Structure formats: C-alpha cells, structure tokens
Swiss-Prot record:
Residues 272-432 are annotated as: Required for dimerization. The gene is ZHX1. Residues 740-764, 863-873 have a biased composition (Basic residues). This is Zinc fingers and homeoboxes protein 1. Residues 831-873 are annotated as: Required for repressor activity. GO terms for biological process: cell differentiation; negative regulation of DNA-templated transcription; negative regulation of transcription by RNA polymerase II; regulation of transcription by RNA polymerase II. Its main location: nucleus. Residues 734-768 are annotated as: Required for nuclear localization. Ubiquitously expressed. Expressed in podocytes. Residues 223-236 have a biased composition (Low complexity).
Length: 873
C-alpha cells in the first residue's frame, strides 16, 4: 500500500499562478484562504483508516518518497520522477486517490483525514445533517469541499449567492447535475469558468447520495477551489438553482391496475448502475469492505441481474473473481444498502421464482417524470430524462427531476394514479414506459417532508395484490385448442402460445396446471370414470373467464359453475340427420378425433371445429356413463349396497341419450365369481391372463379390464367386503389344493367325504353356479380366531390387523378373545365354548352338503375328532 510522502515539499500552488490547464501546485501555504488549515498540516498528514468513497486506507493514497524518489506500496515500482510515478499509479492502480484532502468551507478547516472531518462536524456543527461534499480534482490532488445547505420546508434552498453570482446565472444556465447525467462535452468550451468535467466509469468514483432520507446529496463538481474575492464574481456553480414551481408531470406507468388508486412514493433511481444514487454508508461500519470489487464487471453484472445471490452463486463468484466469499457477501450487502434495495425473504423467493419463469425482466421498467421548466429550456440542451428503476420486487416508482445544483434531497411526490387501461396495456408491460400515449397530469401533492418517505411503494404486478389479469376470449380460445391436443405442452408449444397470446410462460403454465387440476377434481367429485384422452372436456378456472367469454361450442355467457360448462344437450338439437349420421359413423370408426378427421368432418357437415369437438366429447361422456351404469348394476348383484353406492354416478341427467352404442350384457354370478377369484390371485393380470379370462367367462376383454380397474379402486378405498373371504378360500389352492377341498378340515389329502344319500353324483357340481353368492360359506369371526389360535397358540401383534379385517371384530375384542383363551388354558378348562363349536358344526354341515367327492368313506370333522379323543381320555 502506498503511503504519503514524508517530504515537506508543498503539493499546491496559488490559483493565480495556474494556467487554465491547472498545473501542479507548488506551495500549500500560499494557497487560497479557503484551504488554510487550522491544525498542523504535518500532523494531519497521517493517513486515515479508510477513505469515504474508495473505502481504502488514506494511508495508501499518497506514496512515500524514499531517498529522493517515490516508491509504490502496491508493487515494487520506484522512480525519482513525480510525473512518472503519478502516471504509474493512474495506469496501474486506477482505484487509488492520491493526496486527498477534506475542507470545511464554513470554518476554513482543512484535514487529510475523513475521521478528523467527522470529529470537526460533531464539535462545531452539532445536529447538522445537510452537508454537501463537492469533489475538486486537480491532477494528483483530490479535494472534498464540505458545505452546508439550508433546506426549507417546501424543498427549495435558501439563496446563498451574492448579487454578483445572481447576475451570472446566464453563464451557468446550461449546466446540469452530473450526479444524475454525465456532463455535456460543450461544458469544456467555457474556459472562462475554469470548470472541467470528469467522467467516471466506476461506481466508487461517483460520490454517494442519500436516497431514503431528507438529506442533501453530495454532488461531484470539478471546479477551481479558489474562492477569492477576485474570482467570486465570475466563478459560479455549474448547476443552476431552480426553485420549485407548480409543474405538470408526464407519468407513463407500464401497467396500472383497473380501478386501483395508487399512492406512489417517488424515489430517485437510475437504469445505469454506475449512476444510481446511493446511500452514504460510513466506511467505519464496514471494516472488511473491499473497494476493489466495485470495478469488477462480473460482480456488477451479477448484481444487476439479481441483488440477492444464493450461496452457490457466491461460491462461483468467489472462484471466478478471486475474492473470498465473505468479501463478496459484504460487497453485495453494501450495494443493496447503497441502492436502497431491501426485500423480505418472501419477496426474494418470489422474485427469484418469477425470474426463472420468465416474468421478471433484467431491464428495469422506467417511468419518466419531467418538470416542464426543465424540458422546455431555451438553452438547446437535451431534456433531463431521469429514469427510475423498480426498487421493490415488483413495484412502481416515480421520481421527480430536481433542478438545483446540489440535488440534496429526493422529494417524494405522492401521486394518485388511477385508470382502467386496456388489456393490451397490462399484457405488454415490458414495453418501455416512455410512450406517446402518456397522460399529462399535474402533481397533485408534493410532500417533501420526512413523513412522505414512509409511504409504501405501490405495486404494479397484479399477482402482488392477489389479482390475476383476466384473459381475453382470443387467448382462452388458443389455450383451449392447445389443451385439447396435449394437456402437458412442450416448450415449443409454450413458445408458440406466448407469441400468439402475448402471455408469459408462467401464466401459460399456470393456466394448464389449473385446468388439469379442475378437471381432475371435477371427475373425482362426480365419481365419473371417463376416458382420459386428449379430447376430454376442459374444465376452465372461472377466474380466467369473463362474462363475455364464449364457452366451447356456444357463444352464450357462462351463468353458473358447472363441472362440464361447455357442453349442454341443446347443442345437438339443431344438427340435421345427415350431420348426425356422418358424426356417428366417424365416432364408431374411432373415438379419438384427429386433425385430418376433423377437417374432413368440417367439410362434410359444415359444422365448426368447436361443435365437432363438443359432439365427440359429449358422445364419449355419455358412453362412459352408460358403461358405468351397467357396471354398477352388475356390482349390485355380487357385492353390498355400500360398494354399489360408492361407484354410482352422482348425476346422470346431464348426459343425452345416444342409441349408437351397443348394449352390454349383465355379468352372471358365475362370471363374477371367476373375476373375483382372479382378482384375489392378482390385481394386475397380464395380457395372457386377460385373454384367458375372456375366453373362460365369455366376457369382452375391455369389460374385464374395466372391471379390474373399478375393483382396484374399490379395494384401495377399503370397500371390498368379499376380498378376504375369497382370499381365505384360495389360500389352500395356492399351496396345491383345490378351493373346494379346503373346507374338509382334518381330512387326509387322499380321502374325501361321501355324498348324501338320494343325491345324484355330480349334480351339485353342475348346478353350483346357480347358487350365486351362497356358493362360499363364510366363517364367523370367532372361527377365524379359533383357527389362528389352534395354529399359533398365541396372538402375534403383527397379525392383529389381518385378524381384525378377517373377523370384522375390533382390536380390543380380538385381544380379549385371545386373553380368554390363555386364561382357560392356564386354568385347564375347555378352551372353546359349546356354542362356538355348534356354529362351526352347522357351518361344516352346510359345506358338506355343497361339496361332493367320489369317495364313499366319510370321516368326522377335525373338531369332532378332537372332542371324541378328549372323551376317550
């Protein structure tokens, strides 16, 4: 780091000895009175810890002279020539400010340290906040002159110039504030003013300005520091002081919500990040701030894209910029403070989400507010167009162009903007704000007090208010046509819709998502098992529809919510018999309507695309309802009423009758038994198993597939009462035994029961399908528990759920039953009561009547044999 020269050679000369080119000053003691120090100059030549703009040590901003030469502390460069040394510093270390000084013009106080100037202000200017720093740069020396502005209540300034300065306003009338816009080149032609313009390309060279408080901003003005009486008559400020006056402002908001009055707080901002007004941040509060990052283009571009980087982005930036993550974090925090960016975590997440959805644009939308006394200036200069960047996310910000030379305050303007713009204005909010359609309005209220700063910035994006801009009829028509083709559009389709409809990518995706959600909920609420293909009825979110928007197939406005609002029976009344014949023939050929078939039908029937789509969709809906009704009737024959009520449609009145579909035969009990047995074996049959079931049962393969789908749905909801009984009946079949032999408990494998007398052999096997549901006799709850106890002798908690489901008993009942068996076993009494055994005997006798065997022998059931063995003992 470079340090100040320890030489006593002065670094300034009198202004009278200077030519217009401002050569190096020779003697500080002979300088103008305004720069006369009140302290020991040598004592105050000690470098300060940090400099106000560069946030680097002032100790590093002047180089040390060693043995008649100059040594650079940034590198190993040494030279005895001061000009060569300064050229080296300017070219190799552009961030370094050489030989900076701070002057309080009010007190003629000079110091080399900013800390000393702060202490001076606390001591001699207590409570004063309206300071203005003016930077004066002369070759190798940078002087910051501090003045005090007298700010009045209405935002104007007390006139400080004397009579001679007031007479010279025509000389400075062409000047404009360089804190807002770069100085015009023509300013350099006025040699008599001894003013030069300094163009800064880096953020740190531009003095920082207050943005959110009623404080004067510092203004960067390059001028001769001499304020002697001989030059006071001709030396004037570059920027002409313009007192506030009633002026109309041109307000062109990118989009204003319909019927919404917005109180808009005006704050100053600028599109160019190098010219954005900044909050003055005391460098002492950020000890680890590295000013070298201010010139890093990578960090500047990243900040301009999004001011809140993630940890992963900070890591990448640290690797690319060769700085530590902590330094980058502090730099981003300081930039947000400078630019007045303060978002909540929710706003950050919302802004990041919208940025990746394509709804947040990196180019800020701007609104121009131009006072007429500036825009109609007679000096021929371009008007001052002060743009404002959207500070909030999202937000509408207006700013007023001040005309004073100091621009110390950004007076908030409370504007009430109300209007009902057209739909195109809301959709095309990306268009730059300065449009010919701007409406001229007077500033209704100018409130420069600090209370106005507390007004919240009004938001422009409708999503921030929970309001969605309604889509037009043309937009909805395009979206519906695309939805009919594919419910999950590809990126190419989304891009095409964005070009046609003018909607953003996020809005299109949200519309498709909402439509799928509403359609799915409507199906589940109505319990309709419809054909879910690309031509299914679209259920549109009502928030997207307007009262004038047409539905698919009719131009009548939608009056009330209906799960299928687009299709009603009266749409088919006006079709001729020839049109219906062509449509039905096409539907029987294929229920999926292709584009080629649609064009052919349009040519033959002279119907519109929407009418044909509506007819096909309604046809498929009516067909599905009929099949569903038949399936319900079949389920009623083989299952309980609860199961039938679960799958019955809630409303069938809305489906028009269609005689083109064939009548499906009702399933017989034998067919239902085969299907249920197959369902117990596997809920997802293979294609070969489907073909086998179709061949054995005589049902159509599509009916079997549909039955399995409905049964799986009922099984998932716990509505299959017969499942466990069929499962227990087929358990022995999976071990190699037939389901009919399972009921012969206690019988050896090769032996069977004799058939009852008087019954012909095999007659029951022929007619057993006619018995329907009585084919299988179910065990009682205690019988299932008894079988489990005889097998395991105790209750395993892992099997408790299965026992509860099979026995249809409660958890506590099952536990109490097993506890009772355990107690009986310990006491040595009969484990099972007589009534339980009698019930099982009756059950077994009924089963014996149903089953036949070729064997003429008979053995008693297992439980009877146990009783006999006990009696023998």
């Amino acid at each position: 780091m470079a340090s100040r020269r320890k030489s006593t050679t002065p670094c300034m000369v009198l202004a009278s000895e200077q030519d217009p080119d401002l050569e190096l000053i020779s003697d500080l003691d002979e300088g103008p009175p305004v720069l006369t120090p009140v302290e020991n100059t040598r004592a105050e030549s000690i470098s300060s810890d940090e400099e106000v703009h560069e946030s680097v040590d002032s100790d590093n901003q002047q180089n040390k002279k060693v043995e008649g030469g100059y040594e650079c502390k940034y590198c190993t460069f040494q030279t005895p020539d001061l000009n060569m040394f300064t050229f080296h510093v300017d070219s190799e270390h552009p961030n370094v400010v050489l030989n900076s000084s701070y002057v309080c013009v009010e007190c003629n106080f000079l110091t080399k340290r900013y800390d000393a100037l702060s202490e001076h202000n606390l001591k001699y200017h207590p409570g004063e906040e309206n300071f203005k720093l003016t930077m004066v740069k002369r070759n190798n020396q940078t002087i910051f002159e501090q003045t005090i502005n007298d700010l009045t209540f209405d935002g104007s300034f007390v006139k400080e110039e004397n009579a001679e300065q007031a007479e010279s306003t025509e000389v400075s009338s062409s000047g404009i504030s360089i804190s807002k816009t770069p100085i015009m080149k023509m300013m350099k032609n006025k040699v008599e003013n001894k003013r030069i313009a300094v163009h800064h390309n880096s953020v740190e060279d531009v003095p920082e300005e207050k943005e959110n408080e009623i404080k004067p901003d510092r203004e960067e003005i390059v001028e001769n520091p001499s304020s002697s009486a001989s030059e006071s008559n001709t030396s004037t400020s570059i920027v002409n002081r313009i007192h506030p006056s009633t002026a109309s402002t041109v307000v062109t908001p990118a989009a204003v919500l319909p019927g919404l009055a917005q109180v808009i707080t005006a704050v100053s901002a600028q599109q160019n990040s190098n010219l954005i007004p900044k909050v003055l941040i005391p460098v002492n509060s950020i000890p680890t701030y590295n000013a070298a990052l201010d010139n890093n283009p990578l960090l500047l571009n990243t900040y301009n894209k999004f001011p809140y980087p993630t940890m992963s982005e900070i890591t990448v930036l640290s690797a690319q910029a060769k700085y530590t993550e902590e330094q980058i974090k502090i730099w981003f925090s300081a930039q947000r403070l400078k630019h007045g960016v303060s978002w909540t975590p929710e706003e950050v997440e919302e802004a990041r989400r919208k940025q990746f959805n394509g709804t947040v644009h990196t180019v800020p939308q701007t609104i121009t507010v131009i006072p007429t006394h500036i825009s109609t200036g007679s000096n021929g200069l371009p008007s001052i167009l002060q743009t404002c960047q959207i500070v909030g996310q999202p937000g509408l910000v207006l700013t007023q162009v001040a005309g004073t030379n100091t621009l110390p305050v950004t007076a908030p303007i409370a504007l009430t903007v109300a209007g009902v713009p057209s739909q195109n204005n809301i959709q095309k909010s990306q268009v730059p704000a300065a449009q010919p359609t701007a409406e001229t309005k007077p500033a209704t209220a100018a409130v420069p007090t600090s209370q106005s700063v507390k007004h919240e910035t009004a938001l422009v994006n409708p999503d921030s208010f929970g309001i969605r801009a309604k889509k037009t009829k043309e937009q909805l028509a395009e979206l519906k046509v695309s939805y009919l083709k594919n419910q999950f559009p590809h990126d190419s389709e989304i891009i095409r819709l964005m070009k046609i409809t003018g909607l953003t990518k996020g809005e299109i995706k949200k519309w498709f998502s909402d439509t799928r959600y509403n359609q799915r909920n409507s199906k589940s609420n109505q319990c309709l098992h419809l054909n879910n293909d690309s031509s299914t009825t679209i259920i549109i979110d009502s928030s997207d529809e307007t009262t004038e928007s047409p539905t698919v197939g009719t131009a009548q406005p939608k009056q009330s919510w209906n799960p299928f609002p687009d299709f009603t029976p009266q749409k088919f009344k006006e079709k001729t018999a020839e049109q219906l014949r062509v449509l039905q023939a096409s539907f029987l050929n294929s229920s999926v309507l292709t584009d080629e078939e649609l064009n052919r039908l349009r040519a033959q029937t002279k119907l519109t695309r929407r009418e044909i789509d509506a007819w096909f969709t309604e046809k498929k809906k009516s067909k599905a309802l009929k099949e569903e009704k038949m399936e319900i009737d079949e389920s009623n024959a083989g299952s309980s009423k609860e199961e039938a009520g679960e799958t019955s449609p809630a409303d069938e009145s809305g489906a028009p009758k269609s005689g083109s579909t064939g009548k499906i035969c009702k399933k017989t009990p034998e067919q239902l038994h085969m299907l249920k047995s197959a369902f117990v074996r596997t809920q997802w049959p293979s294609p070969e198993e489907y073909d086998k079931l179709a061949k054995e049962s005589g049902l159509a393969r599509t009916d079997i597939v549909s039955w399995f789908g409905d049964t799986r749905y009922a099984w998932k909801n716990g509505n299959l009462k017969w499942y466990y009984y069929y499962q227990s009946a087929n358990s022995s079949s999976m071990n190699g035994l037939s389901s009919l032999r399972k009921r012969g408990r206690g019988r050896p494998k090769g032996r069977g029961r004799g058939r009852p007398r008087g019954r012909p052999r095999g007659s029951k096997r022929i007619n057993n399908w006619d018995r329907g549901p009585s084919l299988i006799k179910f065990k009682t709850g205690t019988a299932i528990l008894k079988d489990y106890y005889l097998k395991h002798k105790f209750l395993n908690e892992q099997d408790l759920d299965e026992l509860v489901n099979k026995s249809h008993m409660g958890y506590e009942q099952v536990r109490e039953w097993f506890a009772e068996r355990q107690r009986r076993s310990e006491l040595g009494i009969e484990l099972f009561e007589e009534n339980e055994e009698e019930d099982e005997v009756i059950d077994d006798q009924e089963e014996d009547e149903e089953e036949t065997d070729d064997s003429d022998t008979w053995e008693p059931p297992r439980h009877v044999k146990r009783k006999l063995s006990k009696s023998d003992d």
